[in-house]
Amino acid sequence: MSALHDPDLRGFASDNYSGVHEEVLAAIAAANGAHQVAYGEDVYTEELQRVFRREFGEQAEAFPVFNGTGANVTGLQSMLPRWGAVVSAGTAHINSDEGGAPEKVGGIKILTVESPDGKLTPALVDEQAWGFGDEHRAQPLVVSITQSTELGTVYTPEEVRALADQAHERGMRLHMDGARIANAGAALGLPLRAFTSDAGVDVLSFGGTKNGMLLGEAIVVLDREASSGLTFLRKTNMQLSSKMRFLSAQLLAMLGEDGEAEPLWLRSARHANAMAARLRSQLDEAVAAGRITGLAFTQPTQANAVFATLPAGVADRLRAAYRFYDWNPATGEVRWVCSFDTSEDDIDAFTAAIERELAA
């Protein structure tokens, strides 16, 4: 089949718009051919368990799944009794971008708090972590954070540890939505375990689709006492792949070989972050030099996303050539996301287009 899409089309709507990294495609091809046992009893999934233990510690156990919503819902279900609830930021993906799946599929009550930067703090968790033992209130038993957040901000290991300590002191657990965990790791310049298992996270989702995989994520259990029934929940939630070797092969490609200094997850995420930083710095310079007016940034640029407000009509005109999303139409806030395959030329051309629209 010949390509149906324009190979030159570029955009900043989402890292989900990007293609598949060539090293991931090679890993899929390498795993192809012959027969392997289905449903995760293959050699690739067995090796994946070892590699996740290498990255997160000997206690880690990984469950490959199809997508991020499935990873979050299934992981959280495994952490909660039927009367349990999750405390999250209002901007959290589980609250605002999963179509009600946690509630409808998982039967999970989400208790939200408002956070200006998408990050939770112990003080914010306190707003919902109450009513323990009250049969009239869903019991807040899990705190869920996103790393990096939906607003492009990144938790430090110390911030994660503070939330984990608070949760554990109250008999709660800490869950991490790691759809962009690679971008957080690249931003922090730290091993994955430094802000996950070493910081007290109990269960996380390890994202790959936004970082160059074809599809697939993994639920990673870091404290086995915090989770139960995942083997069965993955099946009942329709997240059990029969040909799991092709999910596991992609994750193996992302995590790299033993001793590899810069595995694919890090190289891809570091590049995406660098392109977001390039976009931010070029626009900062244009504002400072007085070449453009009307643009204001709304969040720090710490990972691979840039948030800004634009004057009325500008976003629609820019979208004639570059796809991106409105984040808050009422205020003119937009989101620009960079990917592993965003080039410097892409950034420079987009910056030039913005400068033409906002020329002083």
Residues covered by each model-derived region:
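Conserved PLP-enzyme active-site core in the AAT-like
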Residues: 2-321, 326-342, 350-358
